[in-house]
């Protein structure tokens, strides 16, 4: 069984979530990030082989983080539902979406392991979720149909969430990039489209980290 999720561009969501937690980076948190990525396929297929060691180790680390930071319980309950759903959903398009949200796991867990509080996590996690939802909606339209007016309308809630929860400069940059990616989506290859979404994710995380480092968030 392949170790990495066969879900196309959703690994970029994992990368974004991991990079978003860079200021919390420790050996423990690096292990959390890697085990999160390596646990998706074993949980989906539940084959009785060595790969099950990854979700077992991830569960052990999650329990340890819960011991360190009781706030962890809220996130564990939410993400447990996502990881369990991977086992029971057989529709590929739905499976991909669930997998993408499950792979946002590193950021909150790395922050919690470092001792971050609930309010410190909620705003960036909401931004990450909103961008993930936008990307998934746009990708679904691009791959299985055509990008249409509904995809342009989806930019509105994305922009509002970013303007409310982040710095105006970051909100403007992400909104502008989202518009460009949406406009170009139908006219470029699927591969180029995937790189465009990766660029959008990296623009968000680099901008967020830079503004956070500068004390502007």
Swiss-Prot record:
Subcellular location(s) of the protein: Cell membrane
The entry's keywords: Cell membrane, Membrane, Transmembrane, Transmembrane helix
Species assigned in the record: Archaeoglobus fulgidus (strain ATCC 49558 / DSM 4304 / JCM 9628 / NBRC 100126 / VC-16)
Domain of life: Archaea
GO cellular component: plasma membrane
Chain ranges passing through the membrane: 13-35, 50-68, 75-94, 109-131, 152-174, 194-216
Membrane topology value: Multi-pass membrane protein
Keyword GTP-binding: no
Protein name in the entry: Uncharacterized protein AF_0172
